[in-house]
Amino acid sequence: MSLPRCTLLWARLPAGRGAGPRAAPCSALRALVGSFPGASGRVPCLAASSSASGGSKAPNTSLFVPLTVKPQGPSADGDVGAELTRPLDKNEVKKILDKFYKRQEIQKLSADYGLDARLFHQAFISFRNYIMQSHSLDVDIHIVLNDICFSAAHVDDLFPFFLRHAKQIFPVLECKDDLRKISDLRIPPNWYPEARARQRKIIFHSGPTNSGKTYHAIQRYLSATSGVYCGPLKLLAHEIFEKSNAAGVPCDLVTGEERLTVEPEGKQATHVSCTVEMCNVATPYEVAVIDEIQMIRDPARGWAWTRALLGLCAEEVHLCGESAAINLVSELLYTTGEEVEVQKYERLTPISVLDHALESLDNLQPGDCIVCFSKNDIYSVSRQIEIRGLESAVIYGSLPPGTKLAQARKFNDPNDPCKILVATDAIGMGLNLSIRRIIFYSLIKPSINEKGEKELEPITTSQALQIAGRAGRFSSHFKEGQVTTMHRDDLALLKDILNRPVDPIQAAGLHPTAEQIEMFAYHLPETTLSNLIDIFVDFAQVDGQYFVCNMDDFKFSAELIQHIPLSLRVRYVFCTAPINKKQPFVCSSLLQFARQYSRNEPLTFAWLRRYIKWPLLPPKNIKDLMDLEAVHDVFDLYLWLSYRFIDMFPDSSLVRSLQKELDAIIQEGVHNITKLIKISESRKLLNLESLPSGDQSRLSGASKSPARRTRGTKSAGNKATEPLSPSDKELPLASRLVQQGLLTADMLRQLQKEWLTQQPEHSREKVGTRRKKKDPDSD
């Protein structure tokens, strides 16, 4: 090697290398980590410094996803380390690395720097692959490995390089303290300086359902010079919006999917009715009303009530809800220096639990409401009621708001023959219903536990009281409410549940903001959004009065669109869009919307019509009805995004008009729901699932897209006269008659019985013989 070349290479080495091959790595190790365990003057480790500064729990390292560090390829300057020393023997290097891995001292030192057994193993595997697969190594590590080969250095001298590599694949190790500060959620009141700048008057209106607590708060809201109403549902926000304007108080409406202004030229009204997530904590009001404050404990949405409670900038804040929330609210507002005035209310009409169960649908009376906790029970009960010659209205959670209101009006109308309501717990709030008797079809409700697992548990006292309280409301035709169960065995349990005291609410929900997630991403730029959320929740520090809300739905959306190239802020907004992850079509629509956005292609009205295969026909069966509900949710998703990205979702008004048309189609389907149930039962009777896929799609409307199942332009009334395609003509006569709506399952059974009874005895024996021979083949 020439002298100039040697001088150049030597100059590139880090300062301190001139002390010799043995001294250099040792000094590097001391400079980075200090003396080894047992020696004085050891550098404090990350874990120790974190503990000292915050006293926080150790992080869940299973959430740390290692990044990939690619081995170094050939260098333009050649292998400088080999030129200064010699080429490394890969077999010798592998032995050195294996010895390094097995050293107990190294494992202990790694643990001090936050590398538990799992992280240490993953970091070592990556470190070894990097060393073994690189064409040329950095000069310093090459020299250390060479020195170890010649016993001129100790294997422990590799630790600084190993730690540097570990921090490359686990960047969270480098910034633990910063991440803990960002995710410190222990003083939420400080997030709202505008609210803290004034002394608010807090009035808690406490009472059971139908006690008038919300009425008194709304009266104060209407008399104020400015006000905001924060409700849990779009239906409630709409109701206050209409009441306020009807009372001559100009009021705007703000929900996730809708904005309505009443003043000319779009000027903001003095009052606004909104869903609680949409309240503006920067706008000053004279009066604010927060409805259903007990939902501050909700595992998914509780953060919105916490934000409204601590952040609304109003002279008076009126809270309406259960008494179970009084203590927690008082404790939270004690930290802000605000006192809570409690006004308690009693129920306006009496309600009683009957001593007998319904036991049979034959015992139904006008004004009865059967509460089910599954759609299958809704369909089954509705069908049984129809068989008895009675009409029923149907309300469940996934129905569009307009359809729910239409069914409520039908049930409440004294001139309508529909006197029975079949509903889920969706009737617990948001609808004014004239119910005389609540009948619990079951007391078991599916729920999702903290691990995301489905559980079947009896309803809570709070849930039972909320639902039972819908009977005999003050404004209804029935001045006394009654509650019972469908089955005799459930009645004692219902009485026990209703007589239990409601457990006081222990904690309020919190939720990371977009700004906090952005700061996390600044420190962990290569980490996925879903993983960022996991790490944030794990690092988050809250006191006993708060909890971090369940973010599984957010993470589901984040993972769904992870491969789409979007900025972090845009990705965050898409992930906060409210979707039902049980609806595949809605999930695929979110993905498609994000993909279009990433291409900078506006999602126009024409594009959306093509996407959903508009126009859509009335549903032919229950599955079609569910598909139409999914399309309605897709419209909601479009409208929700249109208020966040107006340039990319420009046709909100046209989509809203289309959604109203779809709402009418769904209303027609729900009105005829018992007919849809009949057809669905007929499909099961005929075992249509065993037909060829083409015939099945012809009968059931099945296709790749939910919207396509009801695609077409002919009206439902012309279906019986539609010409049959060649494939239809090959179907059995019974299948074709069911397809055209001319026969139902009950009709087929009756025809079969009549045909058998009219045959001579010897003919029936032959038929029976043929069936017996056929059965083994069918198995």
Swiss-Prot record:
Q: Which EC numbers does the record give?
A: 3.6.4.13
| Reactions catalysed according to its record | ATP + H2O = ADP + phosphate + H(+)
State a GO cellular component annotated for this protein: mitochondrial nucleoid
Name the residue ranges with Polar residues bias.
693-703
Residue ranges crossing the lipid bilayer per the database entry = none
Presence of keyword Metal-binding: no
Q: Which family does it belong to?
A: Belongs to the helicase family.
Supply the name of the protein: ATP-dependent RNA helicase SUPV3L1, mitochondrial
Its source organism is Mus musculus
